[in-house]
């Protein structure tokens, strides 16, 4: 029992160490609009803890944006630095934007990366940017709450499984002990019955022999003096199925007995 307890304690320690390593490993969720992210709800996990947003065509200011995790970038030259591309009209604009928070690259508007063209457009962009920030905040709160529940489940499920395993082992040991005790009691009862039947059989045989000796020597000269002995002996013989060598006959008055 002590050995099983030490093994279970070591296994629980290893499980807790593995969970601590997984939880301390930095991973964030990013908004992803690639084809392989459709099945995961337009989200991906970044082990580099970095999300990106970039223009598909750096030379075109009206080019659509693409979003995703920095791990999925094929080229290592775009790793989290804002590249500057010179357009034909002269203004500079970033082709890659990186961030390091959950769903921080969620952008619903193209002009997030584009510079303002006029004062009016800049004012409208500010309002749109504020609404986009509010949406991002809501998404981040929802994601953080889901992440919190997920981490709690990751911690609680192995601990609950370990406790259930310990309870099952203790229950199995208790059942084995009770079964062993029951078998020992049955064995003791069987031995007691055999001992009692053996000694009871020998005592009955002694009583039958004593009865034979008493009936062989009659007290008076009357006939059928052993009638009572015959009845008692026949009852014992019918119960125990013991055959006697003496055949009881009628007393002739001369003390003569007939034997088979």
From Swiss-Prot:
Signal peptide: 1-26
Keyword match Membrane: yes
Subcellular location(s) per record: Membrane
One GO-annotated biological process of the protein: transforming growth factor beta receptor signaling pathway
GO cellular component labels: cytoplasm; plasma membrane
Pfam families tied to this protein: BAMBI, BAMBI_C
Extracellular face residues: 27-152
GO MF, one example: frizzled binding
Tissue: Detected in granulosa and thecal cells of adult ovaries and in spermatogonia, spermatocytes, round spermatids, and Sertoli cells of adult testes.
Membrane topology, record value: Single-pass type I membrane protein
Record-annotated membrane-spanning stretches: 153-173
Sorted UniProt keywords: Glycoprotein, Membrane, Signal, Transmembrane, Transmembrane helix
Glycosylated residues, chain numbering: 87
Positions on the Cytoplasmic side per record topology: 174-260
Keyword Cytoplasm: no
UniProt main location, coarse: membrane
Record family assignment: Belongs to the BAMBI family.
Function: Negatively regulates TGF-beta signaling.
Protein name as it appears in the record: BMP and activin membrane-bound inhibitor homolog
Organism from which the protein derives: Rattus norvegicus (Rat)
């Amino acid at each position: 029992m002590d050995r099983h307890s030490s093994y279970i304690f070591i296994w629980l320690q290893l499980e807790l160490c593995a969970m601590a390593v997984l939880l301390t490993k930095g991973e964030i969720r990013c908004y992803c609009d690639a084809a392989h992210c459709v099945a995961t709800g337009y989200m991906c996990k970044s082990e580099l803890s970095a999300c990106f947003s970039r223009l598909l065509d750096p030379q075109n200011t009206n080019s659509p944006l693409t979003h995703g995790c920095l791990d999925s970038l094929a080229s290592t030259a775009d790793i989290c630095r804002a590249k500057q591309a010179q357009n034909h009209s002269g203004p500079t604009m970033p082709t890659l934007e990186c961030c390091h928070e959950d769903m921080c690259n969620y952008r619903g508007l193209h002009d997030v990366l584009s510079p303002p063209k006029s004062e009016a457009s800049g004012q409208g962009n500010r309002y749109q940017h504020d609404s986009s920030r509010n949406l991002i905040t809501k998404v981040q709160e929802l994601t953080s709450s889901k992440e919190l529940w997920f981490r709690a489940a990751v911690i609680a499920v192995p601990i609950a499984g370990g406790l259930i395993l310990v309870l099952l082992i203790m229950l199995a040991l208790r059942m084995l002990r009770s079964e062993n005790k029951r078998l020992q009691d049955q064995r003791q009862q069987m031995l007691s019955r055999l001992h009692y039947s053996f000694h009871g059989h020998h005592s009955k045989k002694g009583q039958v022999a004593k009865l034979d000796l008493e009936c062989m020597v009659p007290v008076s000269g009357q006939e059928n003096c052993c009638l009572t002995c015959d009845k008692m002996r026949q009852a014992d013989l019918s119960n125990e199925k013991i055959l006697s060598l003496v055949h009881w006959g009628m007393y002739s008055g001369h003390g003569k007995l007939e034997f088979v």
